[in-house]
Amino acid sequence: MLMKQTFLYFLLTCVVSAQFNGYVPPEQNGGDIVVPKDFYEKFGEDFIREQEESSAPLMNPVPERDEAEAPHHPKGHHEFNDDFEDDTALEHPGFKDKLDSFLQPARDFLHTVSDRLDNIFDDDEDEHVREKRPHDSADEDAPRRKHGKCKGKGKHHKGKHAKGKGKKSHPKPEDDSVFFDDERPKHHEFDDEDREFPAHHEPGEHMPPPPMHHKPGEHMPPPPMHHEPGEHMPPPPMHHEPGEHMPPPPMHHEPGEHMPPPPMHHEPGEHMPPPPMHHEPGEHMPPPPMHHEPGEHMPPPPMHHEPGEHMPPPPMHHEPGEHMPPPPMHHEPGEHMPPPPFKHHELEEHEGPEHHRGPEDKEHHKGPKDKEHHKGPKDKEHHKGPKDKEHHKGPKDKEHHKGPKDKEHHKGPKDKEHHQGPKEKHNERPEQNMQSSHELLVIEAFADLINSVPVEEIAEEFSRFLDTLGIEYYGNIPVHIQENAPKDSSIPPLFEFDDDLELSDLTPEQFAYLEMLKAEGIDPMTAFRDQSHPAKPSNAQPADSSRPYAVFSQEENGEHVNLKAFPDHTLRVKDSKPESLGIDTVKQYTGYLDVEDDRHLFFWFFESRNDPENDPVVLWLNGGPGCSSLTGLFMELGPSSINIETLKPEYNPHSWNSNASVIFLDQPINTGFSNGDDSVLDTVTAGKDVYAFLNLFFAKFPQYAHLDFHIAGESYAGHYIPQFAKEIMEHNQGANFFVASGYEMEKQYINLKSVLIGNGLTDPLVQYYFYGKMACESPYGPIMSQEECDRITGAYDTCAKLITGCYQTGFTPVCIGASLYCNNAMIGPFTKTGLNIYDIREECRDQEHLCYPETGAIESYLNQEFVQEALGVEYDYKGCNTEVNIGFLFKGDWMRKTFRDDVTAILEAGLPVLIYAGDADYICNYMGNEAWTDALEWAGQREFYEAELKPWSPNGKEAGRGKSFKNFGYLRLYEAGHMVPFNQPEASLEMLNSWIDGSLFA
């Protein structure tokens, strides 16, 4: 099951990657809503047609066409699944065309992946040859990695359809469609009487020489298929007219037999015969031609040689665009290898064949790395030597070498089936994708799968799944019609819309992704819901300039702050009285960071209760991604909490602003009170907005700019904080000049002193391993059966492959697949326990609000009109935004190693880093956090790893255990869940204060 699920992830990421990488034209992307049958019937065709005619169409219907134009298929025949009994999905106009368009990128991509695998990993002998050919194509200069053999199937792989009418043929490049049974090109048989040479000769019999000259277009007879020892072989013709087909040499020779030399000269476009496929020990190999005309096809060398056999040298010179024959695919020990050509190909397109483009042709003839066509003695699909029954069968071979009637393989200069070149649609890919890290996609993450799954059948398998699910295309949109859904109530239904706002804005590709997982018995939304801090958003109220308290209103008494270094960013500060809410008596500021007029980040600043002129400044960030930092304000470390019964603020004596000024920032866009038409769905981009905000904030409030500055956060802030800190440190090396309120400011320098990450996700490759351990070996006892824990741990092998693929390639579709698989396999089983995933000691009390009723109370409080008026906010409050969460996932942001590497970078720069974790949390548990800090590569890794965990007793009572070396520290806190300040407010405040003053591990 795991193998099949992983295969689905890979297959679907290929389709998604085709969209991301531009393999599908923009007009094929379609609309943005997937419609189930009940939704479709609810609105009806008239509504959809109206939306189609509007400026923002809901769908893009297929135009009607006449019956004569509709594709005809014999009764009982189905294009994608011969076993599928219902024609409903295939009767829709344009279904085949649309499905083909949807699948074609996957086909192209998978064939490219297969070719890449064969190209990158070759035998040691071929590696040695490549090292001696430094001027070969750029593709050979790419980094090499040795892995197990990859058995990508070539074009003559028979697959499971090799017998009977079900056998598939490759489509002609000028047609995107796939050949089905009734339209597959027919093979032409070749009868023995058509041959002009005898099929066999007795020993000593003299072979007649071929004609010395042939008229244009005349077909050359093939030589005998077998010769007895000592028999004399006739020489080939001395001259051929343009376009004349050259006969192939004998397929087998006995020891000592003399091989005839090839022709001395060929006309442009003439097809050169291939050399013998096998030679006996001591047999002399004929040399290749000394000269070839432009565009002439060079014959490949023999596929196998016996020990000691002498290899003929390649031609000394080739014309521009001429195709060079590949060297032998296999050599015996001590065998002499022919030298490479002394002059390399010019990048020109030659006459006749359209598929041989020289060194850049990566689809068919790839030189020494080409395993799709010439694979030597191990190639069981194409050239098998004298025992090859599939390719060279002697005089009775009717499938491949058919003499003058063979139209499938040797067509000469007019061959369009085998030599396609620049018109091949499979080659029309962005150049930057041809020589990038994409070639490592399957190698690192899916190598074992590719070895066991025939590449030729992947697209067909994908079609079968679509048929099974009832996926149809309505216009350019895959529509799931639930008409044929199973009636068994024990089977969970597929995704439905109804009032589920979490799925309402999924793109068609994302929806198809989730449907596939659901069909395999996986509920991906469980992982999203539990790991992303989602809460159903309230209906957003658009900004209204009629509100007198709106920040942007003309009557506002606030201030706009601009900086020369950030022309697209503006800070709007509300000069109001948020302290009127009774949250705290200290000075407070609220406002927005505006980004290009369509993104607005909300902030709330609280001055220190102690000494605001000298106390440090702390930026607090909650995670998610997509969860508001105001959750931290009112539930964890802010000046007040919200009573769940009265919705009144209650004073918090252990607030982190007791000895520091604190900024609570809602980021990224559409988190909390932040809003905008545009989206930021990756950590790196979010970091640029945060850096701009800090510059603008300290420009507006220079009294805080010189103070020590720290960044703290939890959960997905394990991604945010390392990246944001790195962004600040890089910019601190430069100079920025600002304009604030009309006067010039001095060079801005953000005085970053340290970072703190609580129960964060930073290194998934290490952390995901400990879900099984935490489930059965936590200090609070097992929460699952040992069998379930073993099952989770067993799934880690596949999970680790996927995460490693993301780490090594950074390729978004691989990272997406890793997130989907690992979140469901490793975290999904926890949902059956009914416990709080953020604190395994408790039951989940409020599923809609992160299992905590406190978060629901916060949302209700902040959506009161008088509260919003005091804050000057423009939208209703969203505790957690699932759309942002899913957006980060489908950008591949979850599983990248960038953030772990950022921790290394800031440690090496001397910035102190504290990783702390409550030991009752499951989602980002202390076991995983302790393990990744031990495994982190940095200058002090050994000393940190060897350091012992020591008790931490802030008030004479042990509250945790920790260790440190130089500027890196780790602290485990007892009796605390995911939100440490919520469970241990006093200990967490002491942790912050002692960390800031340097006494935490003293």
UniProtKB/Swiss-Prot annotation:
- Where in this protein does the record put region 7 X 9 AA tandem repeats of D-K-E-H-H-K-G-P-K? 361-423
**Which reactions fall under this protein's catalytic activity?**
Release of a C-terminal amino acid with broad specificity
> Metal-binding: is it a keyword of this entry?
no
Q: Where in the cell is it found?
A: Vacuole
Q: Which PROSITE patterns match?
A: CARBOXYPEPT_SER_SER (PS00131)
Per the UniProt entry, the propeptide covers 19-521
What family is this protein classified in?
Belongs to the peptidase S10 family.
- Which named protein is this? Carboxypeptidase Y
Q: Which organism is it from?
A: Schizosaccharomyces pombe (strain 972 / ATCC 24843) (Fission yeast)
- The gene is cpy1
